Amino acid sequence: GGFGALEFKAILGDECPVIVQTNNLPYDTRLNGPASVYCSGKSPVSVALFPADADKSVLDDIMDISPYDKVYQDVLECDLSLVNPSVHSGPCVINFGAIEQQDLRGKFCMYEHFTFGAAKIDWAIDAERKAVGAAFGYQLTPLEDFCEPKGDLHWQDIYQKMHGAPELTPI
């Protein structure tokens, strides 16, 4: 995700190979020391091919290596479906002070500081992202896919997911 396929194309030009891009990072991790990472879980991912009309048989090989949930129309839809920008932004904005404190550097645990206000910011950011996606003809559901609400997504669903997912709360 994160527009990586488009960046590769910009750099490599016509020599750019077929790229299978994901909408999320496959592992839930936290840096816990120099050259050391704690992995608390595996996240489901969905994929898109670049170029969009590439031979889809490459997806069979990918499924053997790392299973995926669905295939997007193209990498723009995939990129706009990356959940991290709308999950991390709220708590980071609300907690700038704690994040910037030198004695907390590297020790800030986002999920411990995920407040009602952070969830409300994330919900608003997601609404803006969906509006951008709709302008391109996409019906984006990244936070719905992530939070699995019983009905329409509300900020409370985001808050509950961030505090109730065993794979996330340790990081």
Q: Model features per residue range: what roles?
A:
Residues 3-6, 123, 127:
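A structural signal for well-ordered alpha-helical segments within the folded catalytic domains
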Residues 13-22, 79-88, 146-152:
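Short, mixed-charge, low-aromatic patches
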Residues 12, 66, 133-136:
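A broad structural signal for alpha-helix termini and local helix breaks/kinks
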Residues 10, 26-121, 125:
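Substrate/ligand-engaging "lid" and interaction regions
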Residues 1-32:
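Rossmann-like NAD(P)(H) cofactor-binding subdomain of soluble oxidoreductases
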Residues 21, 73, 101-102, 139, ...:
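Residue-identity detector for glutamine
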Residues 16-19, 68-74, 137-146:
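Short, surface-exposed acidic
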